[in-house]
Amino acid sequence: MYSNNRVEVFHGDGRLGELEIYPSRELNQQQDDVMKQRKKKQREVMELAKMGIRISHFSQSGERCPPLAILTTISSCGLCFKLEASPSPAQESLSLFYSSCLRDNKTAVMLLGGEELHLVAMYSENIKNDRPCFWAFSVAPGIYDSCLVMLNLRCLGIVFDLDETLVVANTMRSFEDKIDGFQRRINNEMDPQRLAVIVAEMKRYQDDKNLLKQYIESDQVVENGEVIKVQSEIVPALSDNHQPLVRPLIRLQEKNIILTRINPMIRDTSVLVRMRPSWEELRSYLTAKGRKRFEVYVCTMAERDYALEMWRLLDPEGNLINTNDLLARIVCVKSGFKKSLFNVFLDGTCHPKMALVIDDRLKVWDEKDQPRVHVVPAFAPYYSPQAEAAATPVLCVARNVACGVRGGFFRDFDDSLLPRIAEISYENDAEDIPSPPDVSHYLVSEDDTSGLNGNKDPLSFDGMADTEVERRLKEAISASSAVLPAANIDPRIAAPVQFPMASASSVSVPVPVQVVQQAIQPSAMAFPSIPFQQPQQPTSIAKHLVPSEPSLQSSPAREEGEVPESELDPDTRRRLLILQHGQDTRDPAPSEPSFPQRPPVQAPPSHVQSRNGWFPVEEEMDPAQIRRAVSKEYPLDSEMIHMEKHRPRHPSFFSKIDNSTQSDRMLHENRRPPKESLRRDEQLRSNNNLPDSHPFYGEDASWNQSSSRNSDLDFLPERSVSATETSADVLHGIAIKCGAKVEYKPSLVSSTDLRFSVEAWLSNQKIGEGIGKSRREALHKAAEASIQNLADGYMRANGDPGPSHRDATPFTNENISMGNANALNNQPFARDETALPVSSRPTDPRLEGSMRHTGSITALRELCASEGLEMAFQSQRQLPSDMVHRDELHAQVEIDGRVVGEGVGSTWDEARMQAAERALSSVRSMLGQPLHKRQGSPRSFGGMSNKRLKPDFQRSLQRMPSSGRYS
């Protein structure tokens, strides 16, 4: 047991109370130099804290990120110690202080020497323990608030070198020295081929020297017979110690040349600057529509005035670095010293783990920073002028690397770190905290980057998506006559290969780091000691699993605006995936089905917990099975991870996925030979075209389906297996269609071991019951049983479409009868079940329900995406003192920072669904939209936008007379 020590806590001049201090416990017995140094630092901090803790201020409130996640990411020494209030007497001031930290998601800060000590209020796993308890971390001053803002905005740091990375500049003296060197080499060179190369390079230097000479002598140059005079540009003062300058500039846009004068009063300081091609593409990626993806810094060995002018030429509008921050963010290193991220971020504006470096030299950087350096080939416009004209310019590759690093970082932050942090309680220890993401985890080695300059085009994901993505991809696909084929992958290869999606990303220009590093990566939650490993073996496999793109120069798809990665739903991602892989919307050949066939054998997907969204990683297996197939060697049971917590958790940006079980029918259908599938599909199409078969589609997928939609899963591959839509979600959607509400009534089962029972009730009728070892398992089984019972009733009632079945089931209201296909607005819905082969009937209602249900959450996300609104689900945790509603979960929907809907439920899914329903009504009212669209409107067709429907369905809709389409 820990040795107890009491320490007094003050806030300003007021005493809050006493806390007992305990050292952190390290279960890892391996004591390398780094670990020993960390333990030494922790002991020093703890000894200083024992002298008394005086809180000077509070940190900023975390909008998305809990304080523990931020401090885990940026703290170099980890958890320093723990604090817990004494059992008695009660300390009211300390309790209020503790509750304030919990409620506002903030830390209490104590200035400790040259660092800050942050106290993080923690929940206790012991339900009877309502005493204040804290974890303590030590970080550099100011870095917490800076990194909090960056992590909330999904932003990283990027550090650029200047010379031979972004620019090449020469003065008259440097031109003369180099030309003299070429003259000596020409005199000594005997090989005619080498001689020709040297002469050509020297001529390029001479041409630029002549331009610079004209600029120095007459403030003008003659280019292609045209006289170009200088243009005066005003350089504002950077501080009170600087004076505004007026510089004479000449810009030769076609040659990427700028002539400038460092000191306008001294002509000898004139320089000719060659800008590296594709800088504009990289610069536009870093800031899209004013929203920064990276905070930009410069670290160079050049002189300061020269560096400031070079950066002004690169960023004339000051979009990358604000004018007020230039002096702090442009760091000049003296010759003989190494560059260091510690010196770049000396003012605590960023953490080295969150920074990417772009430089043409690796060895000039401190050894500990070298893993975060992406090395680019040196810019050599005189020696190799055609190098930058390659299919993939160097800076486009750098942009792709930055894109992949950012996507990978925040994918792991959202999918691995945040879910685990939400499970951490005061009783846990440092070993239970997962390793945080680090930029170095997502960079390939220098040797591997050589392949990036070719035409190899693996996928990369940048961790962002927006409505602009969908529009641009639709335009690109519709304008193109060629469609990219979907990758035909052996499922034996696809099953163990995991493709991470940082969001519902469009196919962006490539960087293999995303594909390679995560190809067979086990989940970080299951293995906290190796959460971000970078296996390199499946590189060759990964390169063949994706379709190739014609060019890498195009900008990453998600560049303009942004929907947070944590907020994208599976349907949005699925639409983007269909667009990415070039779904052929043209008329299919008569002998081919409209959609690509599934592989002959498809293993059921493992369900991996992920965030609901910033690129949430809740992919379905078809049509992009390879993206989320997880190796069978690393199964995850999300129930075990989230089971039986007595307290609600921190706000989470991922959806909790239940382990749904696929039926034997699904496995059988997946193993069906392609020819059998083709014959059956053709038969189903013919059945769908029967004269008396009139399909009906509600605003969302309803229980009343046309024969074409009930035929089988092949017609809707994107809805075949939903890894994110639980049975409770499906049942809730059915209840919405009925205008009713599903109620779950829990109880205990009399047995030797602890078991839970949950009954599902709809319209005062019991429709199902489930028993399990946990409430979640029991609820899941109850929902499945309810769907099965409803489906059985529906099938019995639908055996004869006549009116005699109108009251076959009790689940009816004035709008919908679950037992009658004719009840909805009295529209005919003829269905000839006998015309279909037995194998084509839907034998697993759970799968049918999963296919049909889209829900209010999906509708709300699509509405927000179409209107350019930013949506987020937030959870509100009850304080320990609230014993009455302790088991209830509260969810709220924030749109553009404004709460528009709230929900309460016994599960997170139930609370979130209720909040989404209320928010959907509010948003539609604010936007002036009708709450109920016309039943047959094309926009509500099948609950999906037309781009998600099979071409056969689209054409049948176009041929349908207006009386059949509109009410």
From Swiss-Prot:
Result of altering E116K: In cpl1-3 and shi4; enhanced expression of abiotic stress-induced genes, and cold-sensitive phenotype
Gene Ontology cellular-component annotations: nuclear speck; nucleus
Q: Where is the composition biased (Basic and acidic residues)?
A: 665-684
Q: What are the DRBM domain coordinates in residue numbering?
A: 724-792, 855-925
Protein location: Nucleus; Nucleus speckle
Instruction: Point to the regions of Polar residues compositional bias.
Output: 955-967
UniProt keywords, alphabetically: Abscisic acid signaling pathway, Developmental protein, Hydrolase, Jasmonic acid signaling pathway, Metal-binding, Nonsense-mediated mRNA decay, Nucleus, Repeat, Repressor, RNA-binding, Transcription, Transcription regulation
Tissue specificity of this protein: Expressed at very low levels in roots, leaves, stems, flowers and siliques.
| InterPro entries, per database record | dsRBD_dom, Fcp1, FCP1_dom, HAD-like_sf, HAD_sf
| EC number(s) per entry | 3.1.3.16
Q: Which residues form a coiled coil?
A: none
* SUPFAM superfamilies assigned: dsRNA-binding domain-like, HAD-like
Could you tell me where the Pro residues compositional bias lies? 590-603
* Annotated knockout phenotype: Grows more rapidly and flower later than wild-type plants. Increased tolerance to salt stress and to ABA during seed germination but more sensitive to freezing damage at the seedling stage, by the enhanced expression of abiotic stress-induced genes. Hypersensitivity to MeJA, accumulates high levels of anthocyanin on medium containing MeJA. Confers wound hyperresponsiveness of JA-biosynthetic genes.
SMART domains in the cross-refs:
CPDc, DSRM
Pfam families, per the entry: dsrm, NIF
This protein's cofactor list reads: Mg(2+); Co(2+); Mn(2+)
How is the activity of this protein governed by pH, according to its UniProt record? Optimum pH is 5.5-6.0.
Task: Please tell me where this protein is predominantly located.
Answer: nucleus
| BP terms from Gene Ontology | abscisic acid-activated signaling pathway; negative regulation of DNA-templated transcription; nuclear-transcribed mRNA catabolic process, nonsense-mediated decay; response to salt stress; response to wounding
Q: List residues of the FCP1 homology domain.
A: 151-401
Broadest EC class assigned to this enzyme? hydrolase
What catalytic activity is recorded? Answer: O-phospho-L-seryl-[protein] + H2O = L-seryl-[protein] + phosphate; O-phospho-L-threonyl-[protein] + H2O = L-threonyl-[protein] + phosphate
Which function does this protein serve?
Answer: Processively dephosphorylates 'Ser-5' but not 'Ser-2' of the heptad repeats YSPTSPS in the C-terminal domain of the largest RNA polymerase II subunit (RPB1). This promotes the activity of RNA polymerase II. Together with CPL2, required for male gametes fertility. Multifunctional regulator that modulates plant growth, stress, and phytohormones responses. Negative regulator of stress gene transcription involved in abscisic acid (ABA) mediated and jasmonic acid (JA) mediated signaling pathways, NaCl, osmotic stress, wounding, and cold resistance.
Relate the assembly described in the record: Interacts with FREE1, ANAC019, MYB3, MYB4 and MYB32. Binds to DMS3. Interacts with RCF3. Interacts with RS40 and RS41. Interacts with EIF4A3. Interacts with UPF3.
Protein name in UniProt: RNA polymerase II C-terminal domain phosphatase-like 1
- Organism for this UniProt entry: Arabidopsis thaliana (Mouse-ear cress)
This chain is encoded by the gene named CPL1
